[in-house]
Design a protein with these regions (language model features):
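Metal-dependent DNA phosphodiester-chemistry modules and their immediately adjacent helices/loops
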Residues: 218, 222-241
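TOPRIM metal-binding catalytic domain and adjacent DNA-binding surface shared by DnaG-type primases
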Residues: 14-93, 101, 110-124, 181, ...
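Cys/His/Pro-rich metal-binding microdomains
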Residues: 8
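Flanking scaffold residues of small Cys/His-coordinated metal-binding clusters
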Residues: 2
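Phosphate-handling DNA/RNA-contact segment within nucleic-acid enzymes
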Residues: 71-184, 200
Length: 241
């Protein structure tokens, strides 16, 4: 028998055997990890990758994207990466990282807030996406109040009463309560799959379904960036409106 695991941040996965075995004595050295803040300005490799995804340099800078070399565990190599910053009062406290050559992911620090939340105009419609690239795609299309959840989607809707003090998976929602309460409408733009739909339902359940609209993506598209790349801005506008 074994237990399988999967990390939604770096996409590491595997299995651990449950068979009892004798473990050798291993000398352990304490290691301290620090969040890296000195990422590079956007380079050609990053800008080229973003352009293929429909994102301009102007939008990339507006949303604070950076470049950097980073070791990607799943690829077992150092790669050119795009860096998605998570900020608090203008200071980056964590970052999600994606290689631009291969589809590899990593994380620096622990994202705990909405991505792009500090660029939101309070009192306007708020667009909640499942991934950073989807939020950036909406910004590219003129929807400046687009944010992304910090964690991966939930697998299923869970019934029962919600206690904000114990709702750790959705703490980012409660931390942004003043912005959410002030928004005219909440447009939920999660992925078009079971997990994305469950995430959208859980978000709406916490905010209040009377204030939420859930986007339905066109056939053949699973998220906002997919629509932008395959069908263009006009189709994004049609879906969002």
């Amino acid at each position: 028998d074994s237990i399988v695991y999967n990390c939604w941040h770096c996409e590491a996965s595997g299995g651990v055997s449950l068979q009892e075995r004798q473990m050798p004595n291993v000398r352990r050295n304490k290691v301290t990890l620090a969040v890296k803040h000195d990422w590079d300005d956007l380079n050609e490799a990053t800008l080229s990758w973003l352009e293929k995804r429909g994102i301009s340099e102007e939008t990339a800078r507006e949303t604070g994207l950076k470049s950097g070399k980073h070791f990607i565990s799943a690829l077992q190599k150092q790669s050119d990466c795009v860096v998605f910053p998570y900020t608090n009062q203008g200071r980056m406290y964590a970052a999600k990282i994606r290689s631009v050559e291969d589809k590899g992911f990593s994380c620096n620090g622990s994202p705990a807030s909405f991505f792009n939340i500090e660029n939101v105009v309070i009192g306007e419609d708020l667009y909640i996406c499942e991934g950073e690239m989807d939020a950036i795609s909406l910004v590219q299309c003129g929807y400046e109040n687009a944010v992304s959840v910090p964690n991966g989607a939930v697998m299923k809707v869970v019934d029962g009463k919600i206690d904000p003090k114990e709702d750790n998976k959705f703490k980012f929602l409660w931390d942004a309560k003043n912005i959410i309460d002030a928004a005219k409408k909440i447009i939920i733009c999660t992925d078009d799959d079971g997990a994305g739909q469950a995430m959208g339902e859980e978000i709406a359940r916490r905010i209040g379904k009377d204030k939420c609209w859930i986007v339905e993506w066109p056939d053949g598209c699973k998220d906002a960036n997919d629509v932008l790349v395959k069908k263009g801005k006009k189709e994004v506008d049609k879906v969002i409106y």
